[in-house]
Amino acid sequence: MKIVIVGTFPPYRGGISNFYQTLYEKLSNSHDVTAINFSLQYPNMLFPGNSQFDNNQKSDSNIERIINSINPVSWYKAAKKIIELKPDLIIFKYWMPFFAPSFGSIMRFIKKNIKIRSLVICDNIIPHESRFFDNILTKYFFKYIDYFIVMSKSVESDLLSLFPDAKYIYTPHPLYDIFGKGINKDNSRRQLKINESKLILFFGLIRPYKGLDLLIQATNVLKNKLTDFKILAIGDCYENPEPYSNMINEYKINDIFDLRLEFVPHNKVRLYFSAADIIVLPYKSATQSGIVPVAYHFNKPVVVTNVGGLGEIVQEGKTGYVSNPDSVEIANSIIEYFSNLDKVNFKENIKKYNKNFSWDKFIEIIQRIVVK
């Protein structure tokens, strides 16, 4: 099958880019795949982080950077390129309505000229910080799409609220296997200057909905109930970090809560996950998260909150714990994990469970949905 994938690839950084690159590589094993990348993903004035790029990741010379998200001329150029290729299938990933005008216009140009099947892999349909025009933009894009893949029940519900007759398949987010194998825990902790025997990790972009404040509050509970532990929270901050620093100072937990406001490059991800005992996602809202598949790849258990689809891929007491988005409950779940280490083999449970999240299965679903 001849396939075109449109979206975010390296040198752009982050989970979306990682997903696209992995999808491209996996599909290329058995199909003729062309990828089209952004020349401009976000204007700098609209990007809240320090940089859009990961300098440690090289862009694939076979992937053309054509699409400028705010330049309609580039949308036409991308559509023209795809029309010339005459693919059987075009694939997009959708995570925010900002890209709906460019993606929708590309599909409109294409549909006027050739018959082509189209598929959207849905991360988010209704964004975390929604605005009144989001549904209008999403509908504009989605009306040109034939098939959808949703990776959580909450996204499934959002899709059906906009398009009750949508043709879709639900399947969980596949594992990220692009970060390499885990490394020795003691060595990784030495590199990170972590001396405590217990390490709890919060990883990824820091945004209001991700509940870092809940984890700080949970740490204030843990300091009286857990011994010899460190909480490491690392990620680029998409908001003012001062309130978090103030909370840490107020609770006098500077010695046990290590807040590092920095992006972790691709080649350093395994260092942090290898060092950790457990990964915590104290989110206040969510659809699904790419952090859980990364944790599972490194056979690390998780504590997640029961928002969106986070709890759908956690086997309670076997691969992790599901908590309400409440600081005391999050703290209790962390305590329960450490209390059960001699009773539960979390690592082996996760290894078995990971068979449900293979990329082979995900690719098979893409093939199945478009040949119906």
Features from the language model and the residues they span:
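Acidic donor-binding loop of glycosyltransferase active sites
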Residues: 271-287, 300
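Nucleotide-activated donor-binding/catalytic signature segment of Leloir-type glycosyltransferases, i.e.
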Residues: 66, 244-267
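Donor nucleotide-sugar binding/catalytic pocket of nucleotide-sugar-dependent glycosyltransferases
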Residues: 143-182
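Conserved donor-binding/catalytic core segment of Leloir-type glycosyltransferases
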Residues: 194-210, 216-219, 231-232
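Short hydrophobic beta-strand element within catalytic cores of glycosyltransferases
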Residues: 281, 295, 301-304, 314
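Conserved acidic donor-binding segment of nucleotide-sugar-dependent glycosyltransferases
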Residues: 316-328, 336-341
